[in-house]
């Protein structure tokens, strides 16, 4: 009898709580969403693949929904129509950032163009990025560096083809991306598979990616900030400190060289010159922090996208053959591809779009935040709410995409859909004023790497695995990675 009383009391309390939550949601006019549990809210619904969990919930609650994740009110956008409302029509209202606690290490969020509020400092840094690093003229001027680094990747794969060893595609692409950026910025390689010191830098950047991608209790329960229960901020402080120390040394070295040997005219020189001529735009601290931004944002996204593209090629041999046939016809089998060739390779570009549709590198984009209450499609988004745009769900929306889960590059052959933030059905790089500033570089680099790998070798899965058996399971983190790294064996065409 006592147990029955306890059970009935608990059921009554739960019913009251559900009713209170429902009335509270109605009173506040929040978007629909699951009823939260006491204290944890809806955290239990996320699982280890929250992009999938929230996509599934959106089918029940709608393309705009609200959840309580711990202490944080979170609004989730899951359709192109709602994304356009948030990222274009009300872009300014949704332009602030929800800053992960890990980015409080070394106060990185106070210097980073990714996390700064849209204000004068942010505008100055965006101007520097757009004019001096990612402009068409600047990218044209250093095109030869990217070609050289991609050819070094091909040479690495050729060595493996001669020995019959498999290539860890993601790791090889990660190393190439690091060296590509380090040459653009510092005119030197910072990683080498045969150098312990270079390996240390590669591991440092990799560890930053790993820590940044871990779910952090503090992000859901800010009252735990001083405790840092998982030690994530502590480890990020160590990693950031070591990278910034390295960058500081490279800046000192360059300043000395400029006094005696003149300028190299790479990104670092351009930034130092800008700092001297317009110190109000950027200073030394911002230069070092911008370099950190570039490495963190530009390596994992590039390598994971290339790994997914190669995985889809190996999973779908007919698509790989079609891509290779186009390359052979337009470029010539085994010949070097230049960036200027990409526009003559429509099917390769479609492969890239389809890869980014199914496997957006950052599934929730970068979290946004509203500083004031905002109305969206009749619903209230309360002040301080975190806003997640589920680009993964939008790219797999069955009301927009025919056979949405199938890899079909052909769907883009007659389509005008673009990935530059104008078409909200496909926004792997975001949209609006917060769109990824590195987009112009990514649109050159990833197709060049993929086309070069496919035009230089035939590829098969390690151990004679059949294409249908290739595991395409995802691993959620700062980027959307393959749960099981792609290992493939190159052979001579």
Curated annotation (Swiss-Prot):
Subcellular localization, as worded in the UniProt entry: Endoplasmic reticulum membrane
Cytoplasmic side: 24-493
UniProt keyword list: Endoplasmic reticulum, Heme, Iron, Membrane, Metal-binding, Monooxygenase, NADP, Oxidoreductase, Transmembrane, Transmembrane helix
PROSITE patterns for the chain: CYTOCHROME_P450 (PS00086)
InterPro entries named among the record's database cross-references: Cyt_P450, Cyt_P450_CS, Cyt_P450_E_grp-I, Cyt_P450_sf
Signal peptide positions on this chain: none
Gene3D superfamilies (UniProt xref): Cytochrome P450 (1.10.630.10)
Record PANTHER family: CYTOCHROME P450, FAMILY 76, SUBFAMILY C, POLYPEPTIDE 5-RELATED, GERANIOL 8-HYDROXYLASE-LIKE
Annotated function: Hydroxylase involved in the biosynthesis of hydroxygeraniol, a precursor of the terpenoid indole alkaloids such as vinblastine and vincristine. Also able to hydroxylate in vitro nerol and to catalyze 3'-hydroxylation of the flavanone naringenin to form eriodictyol. No activity with apigenin, kaempferol, p-coumaric acid and ferulic acid as substrates.
Name of the protein this chain belongs to: Geraniol 8-hydroxylase
Organism: Catharanthus roseus
